[in-house]
From Swiss-Prot:
Family stated for the protein in its record: Belongs to the Tevenvirinae sliding-clamp-loader small subunit family.
Organism of origin: Enterobacteria phage T4
Pfam family, one: Phage_clamp_A
Coiled-coil annotated spans: none
GO biological process terms, semicolon-separated: bidirectional double-stranded viral DNA replication; DNA replication
Gene: 62
This protein's UniProt keywords: DNA replication, DNA-binding, Viral DNA replication
Protein name: Sliding-clamp-loader small subunit
InterPro entries noted in UniProt: Phage_clamp_gp62
Superkingdom in the source lineage: Viruses
Disulfide bonds: none
Function text: Forms the sliding-clamp-loader together with the small subunit. The clamp loader holds the clamp in an open conformation and places it onto the DNA.
């Protein structure tokens, strides 16, 4: 309470503005924003649970929404259709179509991730380095050598290329590097 009746109490936004502390002004303005990840999960939740959600003020990413829904088989027809024709639609129309087409349900789970076999990556990188070709050609070389039964002979010749620096290019995991080095010595 002020001693004088003429004193006006300023809120944090006004204090920041009058003091021309622009970082404080920005942080005060940011306090009204929702985090992008919360908005994303709110949008996905609205599609899954068929609840109303206004996306006019939200950061709507068609790609991320389609990617999230494509992790579940029952959503694939709707996601496939949007992948083909949805790029020309507005965000609101895209959202409305998915609201209508995706079946209602709880969808929780980890997203699918690519898991590469470090041994395969080592062999492909060795072949690419030896024959000075790109990764796709090295994969073709590997299949041809395997078919002809010559892959073990070639790997025996190439084990000298397996150095610590080369293994760092293959994987950053130190434990895997040691295992790959041990494997290469056994060739």
């Amino acid at each position: 309470m002020s001693l004088f009746k003429d004193d006006i109490q300023l809120n944090e936004h006004q204090v920041a503005w009058y003091s021309k502390d622009w970082t404080a002004v920005q942080s005060a303005a940011d306090s009204f924003k929702e985090k992008a990840e919360n908005e994303f999960f709110e949008i996905i939740g609205a599609i899954n649970n068929k609840t109303k959600c206004s996306i006019a003020q939200k950061d709507y990413s068609k790609f991320m929404v389609e990617n999230a829904l494509s992790q579940f088989p029952e959503c694939m027809p709707a996601v496939y259709a949007m992948n083909l024709i949805g790029s020309g639609l507005s965000d609101e129309a895209h959202f409305n179509y998915l609201m209508a087409a995706v079946p209602r349900g709880k969808r929780y789970g980890k997203w699918a991730k690519l898991v590469e076999d470090s041994t395969e990556v080592l062999i492909i990188k060795l072949l690419a380095k030896r024959y000075q070709v790109n990764t796709n050609d090295a994969i073709n070389y590997k299949s041809i050598l395997t078919k002809n039964g010559k892959l073990p002979l070639v790997l025996k010749e190439l084990k000298g290329l397996v150095t610590d620096d080369f293994l760092k290019e293959v994987t950053k995991n130190v434990k895997e590097q040691k295992q790959l080095k041990k494997l290469a010595l056994e060739w």
